[in-house]
Amino acid sequence: MASSREIRNKIKSIKNTQKITRAMEMVAASKMRKAQDRMKKARPYGEKIRNVAAHMSKASVEYRHPFLIDRNSVKRVGIIVVTSDKGLCGGLNTNVLRRALNEIRVWGAEGEQIEVCCIGNKGLGFMSRLGVRVISQVTGLGDAPNMEKLIGAVKVVLDAYTDDHFDRVYIFYNRFVNTMKQIPVMEQLLPLTDEHMRDDGNEAKPARAPWDYIYEPEAKPVIDDIMIRYIEALVYQAVAENMASEQSARMVAMKAASDNAGNLIDELTLIYNKSRQAAITKELSEIVGGAAAV
């Protein structure tokens, strides 16, 4: 059995650790609320630009954007993997990376070549160790998604698809459900599907004539810009959801760590009291035995 001094030192060390985890829990709770607000505020813009993109895709008969054209055969796949820059958030990154790894193995078995864009340091490190070719990366986003930092890496993927280097593009991230639940998901980013191009504003309305736009000087540059902005909005929303998931998972992980530290302190305190009691009993026995011998 450890000495009383060793047990006291362990209790002191665990209490110091508990103070740190409680502080991190409170910080994560504050950041989680802000991340959830950013995630909710990003949704109206995403919905609106989706409706505009849907209108234009149905209205323009003289030009069809490459993002809307399905490829018959799939030989190259580009993926965007969204993870956090930091750890201490439970199994959040592990779950989404495991999901991506499973799909990479399936595509590899089918003879498809994989290239990846990494958003977040954890995903970048994992893909580098895995040996997958990383064509673009974004790290150091901080606590808020920054579109200016994301645009460059996303543009590399979009240009590769436009140049027929990719036949499919997917994105992996953690979808925020609630504080206690985050789900790793895979979504097809390109080509855009009917689900992407649905117009929520017209779902419950009677059929009417197709949308009619007059483009000056021509349709192509306008539609090109709208489609790129729509994809950027989808990526931004995924990053915002992943950040909200990250802070929620970190808060839950730190709370669990604080609770476990408390339980360990209680156990060590009980052991310390037993050890102290045994030492006192032994000392009294020695005194009584000495007195009896005299």
From Swiss-Prot:
Domain of life (superkingdom): Bacteria
Annotated organism of origin: Nitrosomonas eutropha (strain DSM 101675 / C91 / Nm57)
GO molecular function, one term: ATP binding
Summary of the function given for this chain in its UniProt record: Produces ATP from ADP in the presence of a proton gradient across the membrane. The gamma chain is believed to be important in regulating ATPase activity and the flow of protons through the CF(0) complex.
InterPro entries the record matches: ATP_synth_F1_ATPase_gsu, ATP_synth_F1_gsu, ATP_synth_F1_gsu_CS
Signal peptide: none
GO CC annotations on file: plasma membrane; proton-transporting ATP synthase complex
Entry keywords, A to Z: ATP synthesis, Cell inner membrane, Cell membrane, CF(1), Hydrogen ion transport, Ion transport, Membrane, Transport
Name of the protein in question: ATP synthase gamma chain
Keyword Phosphoprotein attributed: no
Protein's cellular compartments: Cell inner membrane
Predominant location: membrane
UniProt record similarity statement: Belongs to the ATPase gamma chain family.
Subunit structure: F-type ATPases have 2 components, CF(1) - the catalytic core - and CF(0) - the membrane proton channel. CF(1) has five subunits: alpha(3), beta(3), gamma(1), delta(1), epsilon(1). CF(0) has three main subunits: a, b and c.
UniProt entry tagged with the keyword Ion transport: yes
GO term, biological process aspect, one: proton motive force-driven plasma membrane ATP synthesis
